[in-house]
Amino acid sequence: MYLENLVLHDFRNYADLTINFSQGVNVLLGENAQGKTNLLEAIYVLALTRSHRTANDKELIRWQTTTATLQGRLHKSTGAVPLELELGRRGKRAKVNHLEQAKLSQYVGNLNVIVFAPEDLSIVKGAPAVRRRFMDMEFGQMSPKYLYNLSQYRTILKQRNQYLRQLNRQQAKDKVYLGVLSDQLAAFGAEIIHKRLQLLQQLEKWAQAVHSEITQEQEQLTFHYVTQVPTADQTSVDHIYQTLQALYQQQQAKEIFQGTTLLGPHRDDLQFGVNGKNVQTFGSQGQQRTTALSVKLAEIDLMKAETGEYPVLLLDDVLSELDAARQTHLLTAIQDKVQTFLTTPSLDGVARKLINAPKVFEVSHGTLHEEEPH
């Protein structure tokens, strides 16, 4: 798939913008705070209806305006798909093929994107919440069912935590209702864990191949999904469900005392190993960056395998964080494969030599000027 164009109205520092893209590599040149990252963010928001940079949608709407509109014409193997997203005081409205979608979950999954920015190196070394968010955002694009289960799980988790606090304060006494919430949470949690394990197994294979090539077969990358459900990777959804049910029963007194749900996919983690050692704890900075790069490149192939379409790749000032060898591997891997958007202060060195016929835009104060091809 590729994004043919983008039309923005009152998004971040863009009052009005219409821009046509190349199917290959699109380079956004400019100094900091000119709007390069905002443009990549707009593509991400058009795809997922939410930002990867902020949880507050009000920040996405231009100062002293009330509504932001994003439009794009997407091309897939099945044909052209016009997309439109409106962000306003009353929430979000999304259209596909000019038809308003009843639920945002019906909209997500049309345009698939993968973003790789310096902060994505924290996939490896950051807190568990970073890796859970990574799994949820990527797997949610690949599987509408995963997205649905995740939405239901979060709703019930919020209700259950609220009820646990009421029990803790003795504002409620009915533990039968707690059992109902626990059963519902276990059902959706089991689906989430099972799908995570299934997709991680595939992602690991792709990432191992990339990692082996980058390290010239000197290192082996492994994934380990950390969960309180024993042998979850070898069992069915039903077994995970029954195990979660039993664990919630065992932990009931402790959870009431603490007023929160202590186990489930919202507490799970993903660990990376290199040659048998935990790379988060014992890996060098170079190993951590190679791991992050391998995972990101593996996502491209996994998304193609799961959806039938290559995603759009957003590289936000990430070249500055990679040495020449890793830059070379990244740019060679994406060449003539996926539509790519790359932000950078300047295009030189490895990037200038390796990128084949890029479409280059100069970004300054929220305006874009296309460079003449060399």
From Swiss-Prot:
Keyword Aminoacyl-tRNA synthetase belongs to the record: no
Binding site for ATP: G30, E31, N32, A33, Q34, G35, K36, T37
GO biological process: DNA replication; DNA synthesis involved in DNA repair; double-strand break repair; SOS response
A Pfam match: SMC_N
Domain of life: Bacteria
Subcellular location: Cytoplasm
Alphabetized UniProt keyword annotations: ATP-binding, Cytoplasm, DNA damage, DNA repair, DNA replication, DNA-binding, Nucleotide-binding, SOS response
GO molecular function, one term: ATP binding
Record keyword Signal present: no
GO cellular component, one term: cytoplasm
Reported function: The RecF protein is involved in DNA metabolism; it is required for DNA replication and normal SOS inducibility. RecF binds preferentially to single-stranded, linear DNA. It also seems to bind ATP.
Family: Belongs to the RecF family.
Protein name: DNA replication and repair protein RecF
